[in-house]
């Protein structure tokens, strides 16, 4: 993280996998159960996160707590399993004094999703809300913010976390227009308070080889679409150099 941060004046977010993801990638030749292994891994990760925070890292993003995926398994996970996933996540983040993001999506293998029709977060959401994180982000662009309605009955006085919604799709090369982004945000605002809403992408672009140019313009649309809604809400808009006419070639 320190090496990356030296390369830019902008804050660098540190990304790391969730401990509950690892059993599908590791051979367990030592522990009696995968859950015991996960909790030990979570404890080791926790030490690293505390060191990162102490070094000045402003944001740690933990990738893919597995609740939503394992709800789709056959047979599906139990409520007890979902409670364990939340407890393991909270062990990872215990006493970490920096901003924590939990990223969730429906997959990004080779710029693909694991599902043609995206499932719902409905069963996983109550357990996600109990995770010790400052921002919970979910995939929304791919399904036109269909799951935003799941936040309708959330008691916002009980939770202090923010909700990040993806407004550009990592699995499509077609760049969303700013108007499409704005429409996704408006749908989310029907259920999520504006001071709790964070605008992001469904997933990352770089790891799986999406064209840098396409990724760039998706990010431009993300900001320009957000500006449309900011203007509607009377909130200051962000400057977008790409849209500044003084830099145009024609």
Where are these regions (language model features)?
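Domain-level signal for soluble alpha/beta catalytic cores
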Residues: 1-250
């Amino acid at each position: 993280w320190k090496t990356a941060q030296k390369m830019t004046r902008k804050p660098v977010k540190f990304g790391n996998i969730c401990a509950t993801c690892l059993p599908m990638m590791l051979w367990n030749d030592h522990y009696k159960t995968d859950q015991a292994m996960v909790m030990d891994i979570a404890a080791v990760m926790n030490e690293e996160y505390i060191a990162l925070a102490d070094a000045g890292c402003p944001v740690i993003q933990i990738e893919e707590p597995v609740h939503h995926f394992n709800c789709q398994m056959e047979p599906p996970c139990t409520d007890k399993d979902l409670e364990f996933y939340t407890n393991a996540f909270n062990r990872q983040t215990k006493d970490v004094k920096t901003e924590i993001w939990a990223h969730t999506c429906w997959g990004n293998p080779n710029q693909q999703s694991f599902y043609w029709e995206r499932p719902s977060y409905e069963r996983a959401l109550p357990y996600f809300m109990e995770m010790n994180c400052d921002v919970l982000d979910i995939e929304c662009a791919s399904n036109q913010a269909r799951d935003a309605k799941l936040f309708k009955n959330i008691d916002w006085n009980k939770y202090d976390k923010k909700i990040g919604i993806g407004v550009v799709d990592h699995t499509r090369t077609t760049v969303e227009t700013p108007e499409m982004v704005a429409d996704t945000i408006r749908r989310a605002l029907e259920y999520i308070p504006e001071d709790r809403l964070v605008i992001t992408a469904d997933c990352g672009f770089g790891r799986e080889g999406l064209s840098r140019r396409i990724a760039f313009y998706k990010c431009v649309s993300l900001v320009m679409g957000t500006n449309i809604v900011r203007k509607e809400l009377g909130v200051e808009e962000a400057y977008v150099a790409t849209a500044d006419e003084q830099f145009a070639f024609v």
